[in-house]
C-alpha cells in the first residue's frame, strides 16, 4: 500500500475548503473592495498630512479638511470592515466576528465625532474631555484586539489574512496603551493594505473557479 496515512496533505487547504458557490460575491466586487481598501489607506495618510498642516503649520482650513476627511475615511473603513466580516464568514466559515466588528465601528465613530466636536485646546489640557478621549482610545484599542484575535482563530485562510490580523492586533495593543497610539497608525495602515490583498486574492480565486 503506497498511501501513508501520516503524510501531510498534498492539496491546498484554502482551495480545498473553499465553498463551491458564493452567490453574494463576485470577482468584480472583491476587486472593487480591494481598491477601496487602498483608497482608505491613502485617505488616512492624507488626514495625517492635513492634521500636520493644521496643528503644526497653523493652517486653519487644513484642520477642517482633516476633520471631514477623517469622518469620510472612518465611514469607508466601517463599510469595509463589515464586508470583510461577510467575506470571512462566507469564504472561511468564520464565526464570532459580529460583536467585535460592530464595537470597533462604534468606538471609531465615537472617537471621530468627539474629535470634531471638542477643540484641540480642550484635549490638550487635563479635564473631562481629555479623560473621555483617552478612555475611548483604550476601549477602541481593546475591541480592535478582540477583533484581531477572532480573525486569528479563523481556519484555512490566506497567508495575507493572517498578516492582516497580526497587524490589527499590534495596532490595537499599541492604541490601548495610549502612549503608543500615534505609532499605532503604522500597523493599522498596514492592516488596511493587507485587507486589500485579501480581497484581491479572493477575486483571483473566484475568477479561477469560474
What are these regions (language model features)?
Residues 1-28, 204-210:
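Low-complexity, intrinsically disordered extramembrane tails and loops of integral membrane proteins
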Residues 21-207:
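Hydrophobic, aromatic-enriched alpha-helical segments typical of multi-pass transmembrane helices
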Amino acid at each position: 500500500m503506497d498511501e501513508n496515512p501520516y503524510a501531510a496533505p498534498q492539496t491546498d487547504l484554502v482551495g480545498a475548503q473553499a465553498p463551491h458557490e458564493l452567490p453574494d460575491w463576485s470577482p468584480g466586487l472583491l476587486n472593487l473592495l480591494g481598491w477601496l481598501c487602498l483608497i482608505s489607506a491613502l485617505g488616512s495618510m492624507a488626514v495625517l498630512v492635513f492634521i500636520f498642516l493644521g496643528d503644526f503649520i497653523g493652517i486653519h482650513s487644513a484642520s477642517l479638511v482633516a476633520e471631514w476627511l477623517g469622518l469620510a475615511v472612518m465611514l469607508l473603513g466601517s463599510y469595509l470592515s463589515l464586508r470583510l466580516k461577510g467575506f470571512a464568514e462566507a469564504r472561511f466559515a468564520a464565526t464570532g466576528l459580529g460583536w467585535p466588528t460592530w464595537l470597533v465601528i462604534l468606538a471609531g465613530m465615537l472617537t471621530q465625532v468627539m474629535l470634531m466636536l471638542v477643540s484641540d485646546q480642550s484635549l490638550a489640557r487635563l479635564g473631562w474631555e481629555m479623560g473621555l478621549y483617552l478612555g475611548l482610545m483604550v476601549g477602541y484599542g481593546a475591541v480592535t484586539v478582540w477583533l484581531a484575535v477572532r480573525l486569528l482563530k479563523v481556519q484555512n485562510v490566506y497567508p495575507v489574512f493572517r498578516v492582516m490580523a497580526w497587524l490589527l492586533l499590534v495596532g490595537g495593543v499599541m492604541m490601548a496603551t495610549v502612549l503608543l497610539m500615534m505609532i499605532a497608525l503604522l500597523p493599522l495602515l498596514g492592516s488596511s493594505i493587507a485587507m486589500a490583498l485579501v480581497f484581491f486574492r479572493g477575486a483571483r480565486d473566484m475568477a479561477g473557479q469560474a
